[in-house]
């Protein structure tokens, strides 16, 4: 069931599970860009209670045998040359925009292009995604199936600092959505 609003709070707060079941039915295409767009819903209290600095998206992988069943988004979230994750190009840092009422809001655009391409070509499983605002945690990193590394991930600078309301899949004007730019083969 789609929700109109999704509430995300920084660790030890809340998370949202995102399911895109029809993605696997699209068929083989060349993906130029695939992005999950998440828009903040404005509220007057946003000036008092600020949004988290970063949001994070990972994947629930039932094939992981460890107790922690989440992994980085395959192919799109990578360790860069400094040893950190490419959170900026992945979309964890929001951009500022304005909503239909002229209010300043944050918009996150998570880059899922390579992950979606592998789903459509049949080389990658479709996972449920988890959207949250963690402080730090352990994550499985690697390309499934195969040898994974368990890596520590640090996202936000402090615990319990930040909350945000975002549009869910059923919001009338600021719907959470997967935007695909593709070419047919």
State what each model feature region is.
Residues 3-185:
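Secreted, disulfide-rich extracellular signaling modules
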